[in-house]
């Protein structure tokens, strides 16, 4: 009885995973708070961590790795985010406080394996300016 039940559950699990994961899936991502090519101000009095928000479309269930490249070329690994469900804002937190950031060009790199689909890598370039508040 148990081997038959186990075989059925195993076969069902394989069927469901193959039905859900699309090997031809192309995962797209879009910046919500920082859009590629635009300039933004950062509050230099804030000691909050830098965050960025992305949405994904057409992705298999997986995670995306986020990296922030500083103007001097240093790379910071930010928290990973889920790539599903579609059109859901996902926030990544980076290990730098806003009051530690300098004015300059930053890159936000978003990459992932896309489950069993096509891997992806996107780059969002943005210029951040320190906003001095007194």
PLM feature spans:
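Fungal secretory targeting signals
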Residues: 1-25
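Short, compositionally biased P/S/T/A/G/V-rich stretches that sit at domain boundaries
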Residues: 18-48
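Short beta-strand elements
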Residues: 21, 116-134
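Short edge beta-strand/loop segments characteristic of extracellular beta-sandwich folds
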Residues: 49-57
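Extended low-complexity, serine/threonine- and proline-enriched intrinsically disordered segments
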Residues: 61-77
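Short, aromatic- and glycine-rich surface loops/edge beta-strands on solvent-exposed regions
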Residues: 66, 102-115
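Solvent-exposed serine/threonine-rich low-complexity stretches and specific carbohydrate-binding patches
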Residues: 72-89
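Aromatic sugar-binding surface patches on proteins
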Residues: 85-94, 119-121
């Amino acid at each position: 009885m148990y081997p038959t039940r186990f075989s059925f559950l195993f076969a069902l699990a394989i069927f469901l995973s193959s039905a859900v994961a699309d090997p031809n899936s192309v995962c797209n991502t879009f910046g919500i708070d920082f859009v590629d090519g635009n300039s933004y101000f950062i509050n230099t009095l804030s000691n909050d961590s830098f965050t960025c928000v992305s949405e994904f479309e057409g992705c298999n269930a997986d995670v995306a790795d986020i990296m922030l490249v500083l103007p001097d070329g240093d790379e910071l690994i930010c928290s990973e985010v889920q790539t599903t469900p579609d059109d859901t804002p996902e926030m990544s937190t980076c290990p730098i406080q806003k009051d530690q950031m300098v004015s300059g060009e930053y890159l936000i790199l978003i990459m992932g394996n896309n489950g069993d689909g096509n891997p992806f890598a996107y780059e969002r370039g943005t210029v951040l300016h320190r906003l001095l508040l007194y």
